[in-house]
């Protein structure tokens, strides 16, 4: 049995996600098992553009962006699960969210750890659970759906 981790650096992430600055919210994938789980990180710095207005005196990462980062992690897991190479023909879209809960704020200097798990997939729609943590403490949890859709040309 191998202990080798399946990782993704930023170059590989850029091949799978269409997002670019300032909306690419996954920095590295630490490990994944297709069809099961993916662990990723986002390094949160004071240089993030959203901190200019949210909030200048007490910078806090918007919760919707934590959820978006979690959705990006599920998109990566979906691609890896379906053994699909990225193309200009299809994308995995954020399709739904349930049971989103926020437990604490995320501030500059924090490192967000995302753990997403595939629950089921049927006809191009995947259902996932996700947890975001900082220093082992849960920041956010949610159930996320993403859907594979052809891109019209």
Curated annotation (Swiss-Prot):
One of its GO terms (biological process) is fatty acid biosynthetic process. The keyword Lipid biosynthesis applies. It is an enzyme of class 4 (lyase). It is found in: Cytoplasm. Pfam families: FabA. GO terms for molecular function: (3R)-hydroxyacyl-[acyl-carrier-protein] dehydratase activity. It comes from the Bacteria. It catalyses: a (3R)-hydroxyacyl-[ACP] = a (2E)-enoyl-[ACP] + H2O. Keywords: Cytoplasm, Lipid A biosynthesis, Lipid biosynthesis, Lipid metabolism, Lyase. GO terms for cellular component: cytoplasm; membrane. Its EC number is 4.2.1.59. CDD domains: FabZ. SUPFAM superfamilies: Thioesterase/thiol ester dehydrase-isomerase. Coiled coil: none annotated. The active site is at residue 54. Involved in unsaturated fatty acids biosynthesis. Catalyzes the dehydration of short chain beta-hydroxyacyl-ACPs and long chain saturated and unsaturated beta-hydroxyacyl-ACPs. Belongs to the thioester dehydratase family. FabZ subfamily. HAMAP family: FabZ. This is 3-hydroxyacyl-[acyl-carrier-protein] dehydratase FabZ. It comes from Shewanella halifaxensis (strain HAW-EB4).
């Amino acid at each position: 049995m191998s202990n080798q981790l399946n990782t993704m650096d930023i170059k590989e992430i850029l091949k799978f996600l269409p997002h670019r600055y300032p909306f690419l919210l996954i920095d590295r994938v630490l490990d994944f098992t297709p069809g099961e789980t993916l662990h990723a990180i986002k390094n949160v710095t004071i240089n993030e553009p959203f901190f200019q207005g949210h909030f200048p005196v007490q910078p806090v990462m918007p919760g919707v962006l934590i959820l978006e980062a979690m959705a990006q992690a599920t998109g990566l897991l979906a691609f890896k699960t379906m053994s699909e190479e990225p193309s200009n023909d299809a994308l995995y879209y954020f399709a739904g969210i349930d049971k989103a809960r926020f437990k604490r704020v995320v501030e500059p200097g924090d490192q967000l750890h995302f753990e997403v798990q595939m629950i089921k997939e049927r006809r191009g729609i995947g259902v996932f659970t996700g947890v975001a943590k900082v220093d082992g403490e849960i920041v956010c949890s949610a159930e996320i759906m993403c859907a594979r859709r052809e891109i019209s040309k």
